[in-house]
Amino acid sequence: MEEKNSPYSTRESFISELAVAMSVYNIYEDQYLNLTQQNLLFVQRENTVWDEKWPAEGDKVILVDRISSQEAFDQMVEFIDSIEDENITPKLYRALNVRHPFGAFRYAAERAGVIHQWYQWLDRWQNEQAKEWMHENGIDFKDGKIVADGKHTFVWSWKRRH
């Protein structure tokens, strides 16, 4: 199969999109990097009628690791530790001790006026995670294409899925 050109215009745009894919958590889908089609796919774990979302037979793909909830939680703690305003940090720490800490943290950060700093922090960290994953899995973006060393890729086969 002939590989297509990447829809990503730069290495940075690919890393940013990969970072988003790594941070999306859905128990019903896996994220794949399709090297043949040059895109990121969210693939249903169960058979569905949405077959167009699946890689084509013979496509070269690699499963994209997810950022765990614990890793994301730890980033909230690190962000709080970086804030020097003693009036804000207790409010953010309290938000981490409720039943739904991620939503509570976002709400507390919004009310404290640090939500933009949080999102900048989070974007930088997620992009670093994406770069690390790329390095560990032999993935790069060169000459307008996503390339791989082949050590971690596999050829998609419907026989493997059924």
Regions found by a protein language model. Give the residues of each.
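Amphipathic protein-protein interaction modules
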Residues: 72-131
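Long, highly charged low-complexity segments enriched in Glu/Asp and Lys/Arg with interspersed Ser/Thr
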Residues: 120, 124-162
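The feature represents the first ordered module of a protein
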Residues: 11-97
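Short N-terminal edge-element motif at the start of the domain
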Residues: 1-8
